[in-house]
Amino acid sequence: MRYIDLRSDTVTQPTDAMRQCMLHAEVGDDVYGEDPGVNALEAYGADLLGKEAALFVPSGTMSNLLAVMSHCQRGEGAVLGSAAHIYRYEAQGSAVLGSVALQPVPMQADGSLALADVRAAIAPDDVHFTPTRLVCLENTHNGKVLPLPYLREMRELVDEHGLQLHLDGARLFNAVVASGHTVRELVAPFDSVSICLSKGLGAPVGSLLVGSHAFIARARRLRKMVGGGMRQAGILAQAGLFALQQHVVRLADDHRRARQLAEGLAALPGIRLDLAQVQTNMVFLQLTSGESAPLLAFMKARGILFSGYGELRLVTHLQIHDDDIEEVIDAFTEYLGA
């Protein structure tokens, strides 16, 4: 059975064209800095984002870990959102491995951190407190795009306090496509950026961490320390390069399908769904009955998968097509008896 898998854009699979690029990738030893594919990907990624250097790593979790540990010494602190991926879904690696104190502040509905909350969370220059060194933002967060004026305001705030600013940009290019801004514009306020290649962009493995030469040199040493040094990684890097060059513009199709799905579901009885919150490739909804387990079982029996932890999440991606959207709407209609 072919599943319509809307659980996440992490389930994307390489296209035939991407597989051909991987098949013919030239490789070397990346720990020695001799893999042509990795070197090409890192150079392309750094230039694309307007930064000095980049580092290819196996995962977004590792990329964020290296970023926090490169910015902060042991015993220093980072301010971030209470619902941020770094804080909630990365096993507190920055604290466990880096001894960095993570200071959460409330996350707003649009994925932002209130400037007043961040300012209040910055530790005073006093021996009783952990020195704050870093602020982390996430764009997109739950499919929502942080506005460029807000990013610039946050840059001004961190500059006032002599801090660094990191972006978890796992789905950064969704924000680029949705906002109409260039990627350089969206990342200009940040000292470092993590981008995921294996979500909507469709590569099988990997993330890029970008920043200054000095920052990436520190991150490269830490990558080796935590086991992220790879050898003939050009096969994977070639897929990432293909993704950045070929799959960014097509993210608009994912957004269009998410909107089509959201509008179809919002019209059904028994569903609570705020269309204003559907900005990229994620649709969040609730059943007015409050009981999602029977729905998930019903859908799975029909070859449809999505996440349901209280609020239901459906994510469009490279392997979701127009016919799939119609099939999902029809299945919801049947289940709800509409």
UniProtKB/Swiss-Prot annotation:
Keywords: Lyase, Pyridoxal phosphate. The modification N6-(pyridoxal phosphate)lysine is found at K199. It is an enzyme of class 4 (lyase). It catalyses: L-allo-threonine = acetaldehyde + glycine. Gene3D superfamilies: Aspartate Aminotransferase, domain 1, Type I PLP-dependent aspartate aminotransferase-like (Major domain). Pfam families: Beta_elim_lyase (PF01212). SUPFAM superfamilies: PLP-dependent transferases. It comes from the Bacteria. Its cofactor is pyridoxal 5'-phosphate. Its EC number is 4.1.2.49. GO terms for biological process: glycine biosynthetic process; threonine catabolic process. One of its GO terms (cellular component) is cytosol. GO terms for molecular function: L-allo-threonine aldolase activity. Belongs to the threonine aldolase family. Stereospecifically catalyzes the interconversion of L-allo-threonine and glycine. Homotetramer. This is L-allo-threonine aldolase. It comes from Aeromonas jandaei.
